[in-house]
């Protein structure tokens, strides 16, 4: 605008005033803004000059007491008031302001000089100019008085919440009397007084010695890190952890798991082959690395466990970790589940896996066990999310990538191997795959023996064999649950009173014995895990059917042995135990293998016959004999159970399972209906898959048909073309029918006393068991007390960190209270040794009299509390609760109120309010309650410890008066006594420990009072007094020494929460062995002084605990039974009737008649006239025959 105006021969103002046309609405605002800027520049110049003049007139003392951030640079003297102030930004800011003002001034002067001589303008322009000048003068007059009243410029920078960690305590502006080289008498006396005040509430947590000093130093360093992180400008915004780089341990839980040392391979039954293979994977490379170096190879480093649930996959991994971690060798064990590595953040799961493998490498040899690995590494597909594919790819690369993972063994466990990505199931990643089937008979017997080997009395071997026979289909977890339920049943049978009382009764556990009935009851209620999803097709032949089907069963079994012989395979370790003369002959080894396979040709077998001849019982019985062979049922329920896939797809999947687990059996229970219901495509698919099997494959095709041989389906004739592959069932013979009904005839002539339930059972009369005393703590008291102390120390450290953070903000904002409000030089104090004082009483305003600082001429007392003293008490473990911290802050406020300085009172009240707000923010309900309970425990420990120590000191002084052989002991006692009275409790605790180890006659442990405190606080514990010593006194000595051992607090009146002497004596009777160091028990007779000390319900004799037989009192009364009425000749016609009428019956019809007769015998089991039972059976047979013929 200026250049444009100069081109027309004048300035913009001249153009405005000369030309009325130029005074338009568009040009007026621009001119006004320009004038306003020029006038403001002049005003700013004046303000700056006035500010500089005020800065030069400031007093030195006022400048010294100002904070660093408020002191400014003196422009007149060109010097800084404090050379140590690190504020270069303020100087540069001031200089930049001056340069800006000078530049604006020069431009304004040039613009004024370039203007021509002023010419009078129009009336309107003059009126506007006068109005602007008046407004500027008014605005200048408004701001000028306020600006002139300011003594310093305002610091607009945001203050730090906490002071810097490296802030020097030697700042001359924040310390008073720093120039003194040594402390005065008043300062020494007041410091000693404050230390004595600390001893009234200082906790007795071990804080002396090198360990406590290192702990405090470590806590201070961690607190400094916390404060520094909070005061870091980079963390000023965002979440609390924004910008923080986490440590490696925070990113993944890479700590190895603790291994159960009691677990070993002996705890795993029926998996000896897999145990040997795992040993050669882990043990051999550690013990014999030269073997693998000789062949320049790496041992297998990955194995996949798969099988049904509850078959011991996780147990095997735990046993491997325990077996490898012995005394000579240590193997780290890491266990991860699928969800442990997953995260909602992108890439975090992959990072967790990488850190896990890195940690395993650093601690190799190590084992990583992935439980349920199908959830971590599922099959990758196009429909799957990308995150899962990335995790699988990362796991594949870590297991077998460019870098070798060293001696890191990977174990995966799953019950769905088809859901695991196929890339994992190759050598290099998972070198081996172990299939954990359901245990066979021998394995079940071994598992039962493992779970019952610690029972007293042990389970007999015949019972273990019987249980193994009856528990077909049970897994390892099911057998463990079976033994647990049997033990619980024995408890119910022996002591049913326990389930009727809510209180603890007195019993003898040795009387509880597990019997056969307990196992039978357990098997009735249990459902094996293998039968929860599907019913097992195998079932043994019942004893009732053996007379009818035993002959056919043996014939079928012999035929199947020829069709598909299943020889017991030896594992490699058992194979090498036998000599092989042709170990290097390849043809011989190949011929040996062909002998085993070429003798098999398409093993197929069909059981046919009329319906009801026992096909449904023979099929499961045959499968029962092939224990350990994979059985795959192709019945209709299996093919149609998955509605999402077709029948053909189900058939293909089932055939894949059959071929994967050889030897195996394809089982179809009702093949006639199967062929009639299935579509032609499904039958064709099955036939095609069946024909694709190799002729020597050990895959048996077993089918059951309800049609006779002459009426078989054409498809069946095609599949079972050989006569050897078909067995036709026949009707039962006469001899088999006689053997079938013979048990019924024996039951008819039996008396009611021989029949189960024939005579009503007597109801047991259960005696009332006495109440048992309160049990001792379930864990060692010494261990529990140690854990309590550690928990208190952790809680105290947490409180110290919070209080230190609050103190940091107080130190930065309230530096006036860093030292006591009263100067030590202003206190009159006389040295007790010399009787002199540094200053006279007339020169001082305060005096130190009777351990109190008073104002001369008044009764006002001062606590001399300061922030430095509070900080020292914080790190000396003096504050157990935040209330104690607030109490000392309140002392500072009280001193400020007594000084009657308005500024000091205001600052003290502000500090006290901030402390109350900070304490309220830092604590919650649980934290406050925990701190209060910790303070009570510490006070009780201090009271009991001081009492016991004082008691021992008094006894030692009394003994030393009669003996002069050990004069050094008296000196030590005097020193200890003085230390207790004057020194802090930490020193007293240290001296107490040393004295009680050397001087105490009974060597009483200093943890006795902790034991008593724990006993008082525990509701389930019995009050007891523990005398822990390596050499315990004899019973006779204990009577003489008991007065010395007991605490003085227990004499006379017992304080609240401390057990009395009578309670201690009774507790010794109740708990016969509480000592944790294995010393001899104290006899009961030496402790009980009067019958009143023993509670009424506490037994004093071990014989009061009766056995199980003594608990159950059966009413032994002579019961007269009536005479048995039975005619042997009446039984012959019934037998002949059964044989004649049932000839030509099928097996199902015979079973029906059999159950009908059993019902009659059950209803007449209490009948002593057995002839009437024969009549009812004859009548039932005739009625059954009439119904069967109809």
Curated annotation (Swiss-Prot):
Known catalytic reactions: ATP + H2O = ADP + phosphate + H(+)
Phenotype caused by lack of the gene: Abnormal nucleosome distribution. Decreases level of clr4 at the subtelomeric and pericentromeric regions and at DSR (determinant of selective removal) islands containing meiotic genes; decreases di- and tri-methylation of histone H3 'Lys-9' at these regions. Abnormal heterochromatin formation at the pericentromeric outer and inner repeat regions, the subtelomeric region, and the silenced mating-type locus. Impairs centromere function; leads to abnormal mitotic and meiotic chromosome segregation and sensitivity to thiabendazole (spindle poison).
Q: Binding positions for ATP? A: 309-314
Q: What is this protein called?
A: ATPase histone chaperone abo1
Q: Which Gene Ontology terms describe the biological processes this protein takes part in?
A: nucleosome assembly; nucleosome disassembly; transcription initiation-coupled chromatin remodeling
Q: How does it assemble?
A: Homohexamer. Interacts with the FACT complex subunits spt16 and pob3. Interacts with histone H3-H4 (via N-terminus).
Q: Indicate yes or no for the key word Lipid biosynthesis.
A: no
- What Gene Ontology terms describe what this protein does at the molecular function level? ATP binding; ATP hydrolysis activity; ATP-dependent H3-H4 histone complex chaperone activity; chromatin binding; histone binding
Positions with biased composition (Basic and acidic residues) = 1-11, 141-152
Q: Where is the composition biased (Basic residues)?
A: 112-131
Q: Which SMART domains does this UniProt record tie to the protein?
A: AAA
The protein's location, in the record's own words, is:
Nucleus; Chromosome
**Chaperone is among the record's keywords:** yes
Q: What class of enzyme is it?
A: hydrolase
Q: Where is the Bromo domain?
A: 794-922
Transmembrane residue ranges: none
Q: Which GO terms describe its cellular component?
A: chromatin; nucleus
UniProt EC number: 3.6.1.-
Q: Which organism is it from?
A: Schizosaccharomyces pombe (strain 972 / ATCC 24843) (Fission yeast)
Going by the UniProt record, its keywords in alphabetical order are: ATP-binding, Bromodomain, Chaperone, Chromosome, Hydrolase, Nucleotide-binding, Nucleus
């Amino acid at each position: 605008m200026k250049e444009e105006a100069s081109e027309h021969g004048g300035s913009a103002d001249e153009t405005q005033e000369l030309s009325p046309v130029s005074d338009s609405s568009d040009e007026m605002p621009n001119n006004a803004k320009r004038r306003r800027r020029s006038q403001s520049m002049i005003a700013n110049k004046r303000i700056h000059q006035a500010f500089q003049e005020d800065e030069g007139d400031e007093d030195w003392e006022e400048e010294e007491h100002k904070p660093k951030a408020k002191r400014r640079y003196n422009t007149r003297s060109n010097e800084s008031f404090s050379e140590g102030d690190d504020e270069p930004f303020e100087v540069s800011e001031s200089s930049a302001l001056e340069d800006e003002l000078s530049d604006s001034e020069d431009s304004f002067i040039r613009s004024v000089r370039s203007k021509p001589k002023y010419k009078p303008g129009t009336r309107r322009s003059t009126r506007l100019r006068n109005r602007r000048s008046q407004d500027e003068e008014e605005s200048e007059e408004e701001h000028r008085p306020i600006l002139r009243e300011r003594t310093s410029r305002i610091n607009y920078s945001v203050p730090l919440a906490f002071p810097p960690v490296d802030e020097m305590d030697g700042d001359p502006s924040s310390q008073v009397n720093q120039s003194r080289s040594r402390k005065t008498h008043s300062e020494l006396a007041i410091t000693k007084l404050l230390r004595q005040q600390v001893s009234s509430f200082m906790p007795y947590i071990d804080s002396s010695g090198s360990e406590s000093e290192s702990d405090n130093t470590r806590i201070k360093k961690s607190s400094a890190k916390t404060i520094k992180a909070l005061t870091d400008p980079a963390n000023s915004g965002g979440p609390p952890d924004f910008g923080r780089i986490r440590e490696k341990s925070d990113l993944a839980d890479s700590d190895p798991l603790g291994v159960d040392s009691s677990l070993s391979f002996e705890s795993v039954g029926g998996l000896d082959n897999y145990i040997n293979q795992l040993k050669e994977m882990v043990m051999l490379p550690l013990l014999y690395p030269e073997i693998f170096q000789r062949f320049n190879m790496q041992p297998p480093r990955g194995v996949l466990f798969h099988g049904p649930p509850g078959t011991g996959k996780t147990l095997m991994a735990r046993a491997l970790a325990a077996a490898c971690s012995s005394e000579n060798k240590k193997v780290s064990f890491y266990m991860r589940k699928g969800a442990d590595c997953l995260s909602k953040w992108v890439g975090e799961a992959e990072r967790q896996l990488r850190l896990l493998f890195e940690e395993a490498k650093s601690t190799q040899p190590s084992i990583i066990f992935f439980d349920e690995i199908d959830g971590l590494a599922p099959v990758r597909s196009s429909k799957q999310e990308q995150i899962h594919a990335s995790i699988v790819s990362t796991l594949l690369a870590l297991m077998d990538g460019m870098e070798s993972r060293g001696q890191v063994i990977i174990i995966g466990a799953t019950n769905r191997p088809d859901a695991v990505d196929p890339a994992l199931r190759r050598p290099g990643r998972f070198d081996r795959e172990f299939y954990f089937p359901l245990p066979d008979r021998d394995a079940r017997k071994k598992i039962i023996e493992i779970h019952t080997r610690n029972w007293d009395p042990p389970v007999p071997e015949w019972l273990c064999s019987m249980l193994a026979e009856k528990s077909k289909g049970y897994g390892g977890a099911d057998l463990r649950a079976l033994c647990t339920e049997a033990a619980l049943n024995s408890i119910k049978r022996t002591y049913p009173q326990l389930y009727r009382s809510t209180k603890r009764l007195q019993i003898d556990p040795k009387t509880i014995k597990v019997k056969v009935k307990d196992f039978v009851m357990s098997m009735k209620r249990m459902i094996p895990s293998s039968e929860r999803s599907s019913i097992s097709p195998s079932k043994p032949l019942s004893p009732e059917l053996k007379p009818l089907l035993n002959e056919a069963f043996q014939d079928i079994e012999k035929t199947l042995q020829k069709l598909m012989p299943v020889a017991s395979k030896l594992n490699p370790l058992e194979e090498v135990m036998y000599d092989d003369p042709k170990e290097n002959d390849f043809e011989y080894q190949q011929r040996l293998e062909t002998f085993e396979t070429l003798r098999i040709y398409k093993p197929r077998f069909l059981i046919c016959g009329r319906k009801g001849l026992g096909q449904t019982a023979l099929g499961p019985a045959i499968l029962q004999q092939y224990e350990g062979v994979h059985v795959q049922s192709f019945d209709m329920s299996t093919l149609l159970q998955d509605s999402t896939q077709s029948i053909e797809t189900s058939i293909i999947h089932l055939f894949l399972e059959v071929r994967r687990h050889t030897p195996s059996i394809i089982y179809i229970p009702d093949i006639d209906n199967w062929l009639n219901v299935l579509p032609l495509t499904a039958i064709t698919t099955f036939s095609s898959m069946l024909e694709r099997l190799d002729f020597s494959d050990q895959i048996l095709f077993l089918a059951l048909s309800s049609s006779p041989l002459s009426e078989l389906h054409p498809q069946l004739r095609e599949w079972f073309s050989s006569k050897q592959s078909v067995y036709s069932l026949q009707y039962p013979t006469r001899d088999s029918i006689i053997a079938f009904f013979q048990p019924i005839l024996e039951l008819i002539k039996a008396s009611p006393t021989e029949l189960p339930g024939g005579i009503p059972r007597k109801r047991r009369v259960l005696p009332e068991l006495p109440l048992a005393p309160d049990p001792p703590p379930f864990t060692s008291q010494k261990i529990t007390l140690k854990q309590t102390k550690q928990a208190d120390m952790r809680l105290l450290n947490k409180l110290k960190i919070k209080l230190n953070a609050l103190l940091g903000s107080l130190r930065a904002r309230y530096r006036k209270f860093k030292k006591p409000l009263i100067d030590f030089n202003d206190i009159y104090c006389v040295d007790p040794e010399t009787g002199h004082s540094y200053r006279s009483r007339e020169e001082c305003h305060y005096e130190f009299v009777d351990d109190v600082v008073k104002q001369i001429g008044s009764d006002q007392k001062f606590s001399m509390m300061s922030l430095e003293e509070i900080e020292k008490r914080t790190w000396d473990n003096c504050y157990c609760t935040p209330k104690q911290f607030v109490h000392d802050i309140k002392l500072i406020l009280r001193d400020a109120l007594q000084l009657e300085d308005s500024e000091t009172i205001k600052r003290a009240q502000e500090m006290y309010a901030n402390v109350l707000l900070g304490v309220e923010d830092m604590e919650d309900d649980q934290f406050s309650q925990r701190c209060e309970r910790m303070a009570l425990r510490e006070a009780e420990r201090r009271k009991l410890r001081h009492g016991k120590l004082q008691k021992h000191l008094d006894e030692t002084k009394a003994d030393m008066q009669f003996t002069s052989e050990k004069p050094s002991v008296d000196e030590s006692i005097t020193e200890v006594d003085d230390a207790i009275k004057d020194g802090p409790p930490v020193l007293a605790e240290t001296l107490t420990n040393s004295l009680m180890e050397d001087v105490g006659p009974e060597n009483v442990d200093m943890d006795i009072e902790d034991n008593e405190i724990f006993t008082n606080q525990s509701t389930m514990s019995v009050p007891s007094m523990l005398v822990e010593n390596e050499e315990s006194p004899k019973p006779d000595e204990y009577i003489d020494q008991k007065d010395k051992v007991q605490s003085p607090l227990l004499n006379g009146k017992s304080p609240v929460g401390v057990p009395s002497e009578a309670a201690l004596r009774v507790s010794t009777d109740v708990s016969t062995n509480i000592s944790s160091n294995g010393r001899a028990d104290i006899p009961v007779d030496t402790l009980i002084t009067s019958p009143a000390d023993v509670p009424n319900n506490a037994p004093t004799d071990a014989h009061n605990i009766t056995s199980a037989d003594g608990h159950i009192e059966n009413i032994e009364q002579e019961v007269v039974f009536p005479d048995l009425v039975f005619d042997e000749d009446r039984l012959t016609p019934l037998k002949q009737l059964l044989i004649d009428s049932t000839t030509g019956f099928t097996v199902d019809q015979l079973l029906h008649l059999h159950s009908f007769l059993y019902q009659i015998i059950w209803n007449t089991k209490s009948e002593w006239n057995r002839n009437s039972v024969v009549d009812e059976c004859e009548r039932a047979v005739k009625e059954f025959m009439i119904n069967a013929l109809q």
